[in-house]
């Protein structure tokens, strides 16, 4: 099962909690279940051009995307553009990546409170106009 994990606006706490699992070790558990991370920002060694090529291959249909995991809230500001949160190296807002990749995924999983409800990023007047994945 091919899984792409994107981290949007948030602290990465869900990933850190996942990595602290000891019995069983989360990486061994996932591998044993046939789960293959296409990319995870904290677990994968690929970056830059390699990640951009992977995203292009997913969009072209050359790489199957079974599950798209989103960690963190989605910054929609300013004024609905999503430009407050750009996926590094792509020049494309995370909001747009979500819109482009979600229809290609078999399932979309909002990981944690930030991704599901907006989390702490929505506090204090919500200047980034953050929302949950809904």
Regions found by a protein language model. Give the residues of each.
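Iron-sulfur-associated redox domains of electron-transfer enzymes in respiratory
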Residues: 1-134
